[in-house]
Amino acid sequence: MSASQLPHPPRPSQTKIVATLGPASSEPGQIAELIVAGVDVFRLNMAHGNRDEHGVRLAAIRQASDELGQPVAVLTDLAGPKIRLGELPGGELTCDSGAAIRFVRTSPLPPHAPVEGRDGGEPKAERPTELTTTYEPLIDELAVGDRVMLADGTVALTVEEVGKDYARCTVVQPGLIRSRQGVNLPGVKLSAPALGAADLDNAVWAAQSGVDFVGLSFVRTPEEIRRLKSLLRSHGSEAQVIAKIEKPEALDRLGEIVEATDGVMVARGDLGVEIDIARVAVVQKEIIAACNRCRKPVIIATQMLDSMQHSRIPTRAEVTDVANAILDGADACMLSGETAIGEYPRQAVEMMHRIALATEPLCRRRPPLPEPDLDAAGVNQITEATVYAAGRIAEKLDARLVVVASASGATALSLAKNRNYVPTVGVSDSPSTLRRMCLYWGVIPLSGAPTGDSEVLLDYITTWGRNAGLLESGDRIVLIAGTGLAVTAHNMVVVHELA
């Protein structure tokens, strides 16, 4: 497609938006609507639905992206060793303070057993005050005094006795629980690996389906990340790994995990149950800072606009939460139930976009992000210096656009992490690289641009920019040619002034 045929000007939001697909947002028209509203990355949550359903969604995403001429990335989120309650008699149970509740041993489920959102397959309790779970070794790994948190921490139990096939608990924080809700064991080190049999199968499916990012849930060690990367590469996938920080063990090895991964998600739901909820905001800031030092994209997730599942307008606290995540240096904010099962998915995306637009001007007045740890980030020193200089040149010359040409996307990511506030366009001859740029702060991926010759590329960008109303005579463009693009275009900066 020629530059003159590209009708869609870049969105001004520099913060990227990740949206989870589900029953409320899976029709092709709905997906296209969400892209237009501002979605950069779609999340397929493997804890809900099945691969056939996700395959249909993936095809619809790719089709909408092609029709709109706009790259969009896909993140497949592996369920990981999430423990869930089995089926409860009647579907729910009121847990009164001081009541006795027993967990009873269940048989292990096969690797392809249905998970939440599918019919059947969950272990069933026989008595009202007995609970089963999807985690067969639970009884063996509990000890007297352990805390058990149910339903995102709204109900709390204390283990009083552990027998051969049961664990007797007392309710210390009452509330209502339902079938298939989550179970958290703060402080208990579980034997379950981050990649179980079902996760390995789903990772292979993700690799073969050509997704762009794979989320690894409940990460505890960098070795788990390297194992997933190796599996993806063995199936010919270029997908990058997003480590989800949800466990105290991950915080203990945060530096190693950030260094090993390609990106990070601050998964505040389980994290806020596994650690003291009062610490979540501080820990979020620490994780963002670690990612920025290592030049890794970081996504903030869970309950960002949660009330918009049922309301057209978010709470003031939610708006402030999104804004503060942006001010802290997050690259992306994520919507979960808001777009997957909510009543107003498009409005939720539009609201997040509006909050980003209102907040980003203040980012310019904030202290710069920390100096990178180049060894940990794996960033070439020449690339980092070139990108830094190009950003300063663009600001000094009041350039209208920065164009970064990058074969792998590394130069574009480095530019994003330098927080250059001049609108930035990323180009590459690799469609997968362009899609990965969808997660990079402030980088607008532009498909179809000729990358082999700098002069031809500048002509293309000039035509495109004029048609989009972004450029006029006398404006300046700064071009950065990234490492590996072409022999004559390694780490160079070109300033072009429109005639």
Describe the residue ranges of each PLM region.
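Non-catalytic helical/linker scaffolds that mediate oligomerization, partner binding
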Residues: 1-499
